Amino acid sequence: MKIINLGILAHVDAGKTTLTESLLYTSGAIAELGSVDEGTTRTDTMNLERQRGITIQTAVTSFQWEDVKVNIIDTPGHMDFLAEVYRSLSVLDGAVLLVSAKDGIQAQTRILFHALQIMKIPTIFFINKIDQEGIDLPMVYREMKAKLSSEIIVKQKVGQHPHINVTDNDDMEQWDAVIMGNDELLEKYMSGKPFKMSELEQEENRRFQNGTLFPVYHGSAKNNLGTRQLIEVIASKFYSSTPEGQSELCGQVFKIEYSEKRRRFVYVRIYSGTLHLRDVIRISEKEKIKITEMYVPTNGELYSSDTACSGDIVILPNDVLQLNSILGNEILLPQRKFIENPLPMIQTTIAVKKSEQREILLGALTEISDCDPLLKYYVDTTTHEIILSFLGNVQMEVICAILEEKYHVEAEIKEPTVIYMERPLRKAEYTIHIEVPPNPFWASVGLSIEPLPIGSGVQYESRVSLGYLNQSFQNAVMEGVLYGCEQGLYGWKVTDCKICFEYGLYYSPVSTPADFRLLSPIVLEQALKKAGTELLEPYLHFEIYAPQEYLSRAYHDAPRYCADIVSTQIKNDEVILKGEIPARCIQEYRNDLTYFTNGQGVCLTELKGYQPAIGKFICQPRRPNSRIDKVRHMFHKLA
């Protein structure tokens, strides 16, 4: 059986969840249509998803059409969740990108199409809601060519009499994009030679599979118009990316979720081989797991199964496998360009409104962060505050909704701030000697610190020989230094520097590794005070697509948001701006873009890295640190 893993992507409210329901219903997988408005759909499982009409988490369902099984990955549709969209894209064989006939090309549509192009995934356009009043399809086609790709091929005609309908487009004009993209076909066309239809279809299929030509289909998912034709196209046009002739197992985890009973499930795409119940599978050089339970999506539901074939998706109850874990032979994993998850750039504190729910909150955050690589948290050992780091503001809204709906926890979140870092300004050295007051430890430690280029991270080197100071003492110094790097002079993590252990002395038998471990952060702190530190803040690359009249406004607003526009291009009455901007300014910049372009502007961003902070920034008060504060107090007391 041919298995296709299909992604459905769209801007908010374009109808992708409704289309999923229509595909399941038309194929016979379900007997009754679910409704987004009534909250009865198979894929949107959270109240927030139903209330706002957006998909937040990736859901998996399936249907069968003749001898083809189609697994539908109903991917998220909000900009703050593109990281999960990218992760979902990595398991797809193809995608359907919805365009609302009424709303046209939205900013989110362009961002999703951009991601599909980067991943080189074969894509079909489905123009939805064609039965609404005031639809101008020729204008939608023009907009698609201008804002998405000129390489579209309109495969259907839309009629109005006696009622709205879709039929095959047999006009020769539809093949223009195919002919213009092939020199041999273009030469035939220019010389007036006849074409064989098989030549055109073969070239269309080649370019479609390469992700450079995009067929356009039409319908109304809400009324099941055009759904059957779309199913037939999906079953015939898309191919499974599973390598042929491979019997050895290879699979990869692309999603983790927890059930209401707190069972942990991992979603695995099988790329080759077959997974059987009771198989013992290697997941690393030293670790294996036994498959004791497994489920596969079948006709709109999940069913227990004894096998999962190549190309299919399998759900395993498992507490060991992590996102991107590989089952079996890693060499057989398809070589596809993956997009790395960006680092969280924002942090805040979260607290429960009812103190008795604190442990429930911590357990919930552990599960949520396990499922979402863009969320991290830790508990301050002294203040006991729960510190969250994440990527976007809407992510916080979703976390609060999950906490309330799934875990029944009411939480309060403080105003978030950007995560800064610190780098030494110059080289400096500092030494604290044994038996020299106020040093209370049986140890001498001398450290040097110097700045490195931004992006280098922390590099540690010991210049004290093991013959002079044994390994346990050396390890203790390194542990103390790295611990001390957690907070610099402004309370942020220290990075992009080289720290050298220059001098050490111990007294036998009274010295212990703890003496070196406790003294090292104090020495590092003094070295940092001599060196001074500069604040670094996260920067983003941005790419803005907006109406040409926005150009002057963009340059006018750039200094206000510390943005640096490095290139400008005019294309099809549209301006394309590229540049860099501090992450702390991007949300307001985006809001202004949306406001001044009436929602037509698009802003694509990716993390550039950290750069010296400019303009107004927020210093973080030094967090109480029981270990270092106690040692610091001892020094002051003995001084």
Swiss-Prot record:
Listed GO MF terms: GTP binding; GTPase activity
Superkingdom of this protein's organism: Bacteria
Q: Give binding positions for GTP.
A: 10-17, 74-78, 128-131
Domain tr-type G, residue spans? 1-244
What InterPro entries does UniProt report for this protein, alphabetically? EF-G-like_DII, EFG_II, EFG_III/V, EFG_V-like, G_TR_CS, P-loop_NTPase, Ribosomal_Su5_D2-typ_SF, Ribsml_uS5_D2-typ_fold_subgr
Known Pfam families for this protein? EF-G_D2, EFG_C, EFG_III, EFG_IV, GTP_EFTU
The record's SMART domains line, in alphabetical order, gives: EFG_IV (SM00889)
| Protein's GO biological process | response to antibiotic; ribosome disassembly; translation
* UniProt keyword annotations, A-Z: Antibiotic resistance, GTP-binding, Nucleotide-binding, Plasmid, Protein biosynthesis
Q: What does this protein do?
A: Abolishes the inhibitory effect of tetracyclin on protein synthesis by a non-covalent modification of the ribosomes.
PANTHER family documented for this protein: RIBOSOME-RELEASING FACTOR 2, MITOCHONDRIAL, TRANSLATION ELONGATION FACTOR G-RELATED
Q: Which family does it belong to?
A: Belongs to the TRAFAC class translation factor GTPase superfamily. Classic translation factor GTPase family. TetM/TetO subfamily.
- Record's protein name: Tetracycline resistance protein TetO
| Gene from which this protein is expressed | tetO
